Amino acid sequence: MKRPNFLFIMTDTQATNMVGCYSGKPLNTQNIDSLAAEGIRFNSAYICSPVCTPARAGLFTGIYANQSGPWTNNVAPGKNISTMGRYFKDAGYHTCYIGKWHLDGHDYFGTGECPPEWDADYWFDGANYLSELTEKEISLWRNGLNSVEDLQANHIDETFTWAHRISNRAVDFLQQPARAEEPFLMVVSYDEPHHPFTCPVEYLEKYADFYYDLGEKAQDDLANKPEHHRLWAQAMPSPVGDDGLYHHPLYFACNDFVDDQIGRVINALTPEQRENTWVIYTSDHGEMMGAHKLISKGAAMYDDITRIPLIIRSPQGERRQVDTPVSHIDLLPTMMALADIEKPEILPGENILAVKEPRGVMVEFNRYEIEHDSFGGFIPVRCWVTDDFKLVLNLFTSDELYDRRNDLNEMHNLIDDIRFADVRRKMHDALLDYMDKIRDPFRSYQWSLRPWRKDARPRWMGAFRPRPQDGYSPVVRDYDTGLPTQGVKVEEKKQKF
């Protein structure tokens, strides 16, 4: 049987609130909306972490960033960590990655060097884009194109943008003669609609008078929320007033523009390619936009930044919606199942096209960036999302519990409401079990000893859990015996010399 191709499209800073088919807002995302109408739309898809590098690490390695290494921005995965590209290349796929990477441990723009598992002829990270610009153009791109007048005065059209040049390369790849018996995996990774929001002037003109109504989320006084949320709001004041209207023409214009670029790539699939290509679209995280008095993204688990669009279009054209919570951690296992690639033990995710039972998913946060102390520096957070509730453990401050059925805007923190004692206990146990399962290196007894959990007992005292097999690394050997490990054991603490 002919193995399928994969076209994997992702954006940056585009949660469900920025996509028309999810939000119901007039955001002109017709190409994404059309993809949703033709495919499978996941309504409760969550990222691994609400910050760029850790989010991407989870997506492209299939394990959480706390395991793979980049638990904060500008840290690279460990040398023994395999990626989507490696798994698929070794399975005989032509693997191509075009656009923003943000996983090499360097700065925002990357080094421009293509990892060996991807096709170097198409690699186009931020550093590669910068190499095509003059110093004046670089300065304009980062800080000088903030109005209609700026765009007009500098004659900026779509050919100037990183997004357009990414799409050009993707279209070129699709137009190349097919390699006999070699299916492809092409990742198209846009920086847009992330800052600096560069797009042609005609897009910006459309949003001069557009205001996004945040509703009651703009009125959250954070009185029953964790202290670090209030400190964040004080340090980075929201631009939203009492009317609850968010005005950011550049952001909405760039959001519109990247949708058109996505359309260019999807429409470049030939009829023959479409018959055998899975198209996957998602984003790495969202933007608070002033909801809950917060801007940007960071140490919070609100849906505004953690619930992202996820759409999968099959070659057969299956159409449905899925409300069960799923995670970016599930995407690599799902793709491997479709490609008939054996999933290694180390990947905790599941094939989300086959999930039928209720389940929970985890989201984590540890630190925004290694270079600076945004959002308070080290703020360890773990979140567990089910069909009905969301539990958030903020290790250094207070916790949160939200009713996902009756409080869509996450205004009412129920963590101290005794009526939900059984709910929070079960969710707490499930989260701790999952942290145990994935070998979260930040696990400690403080996660279990929460002030609202009177029956809590310390966990993780002495157990040894070897690294699961990844399909590449040698077996893990037991320290005491020197032989291959036989799973979890509880060590007897005694002097060994």
PLM feature segments, named:
Residues 405:
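Residues forming the ATP-binding cleft of Hanks-type serine/threonine protein kinase domains
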Residues 417-461:
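A contiguous, mid-protein "functional segment" used to position or interact
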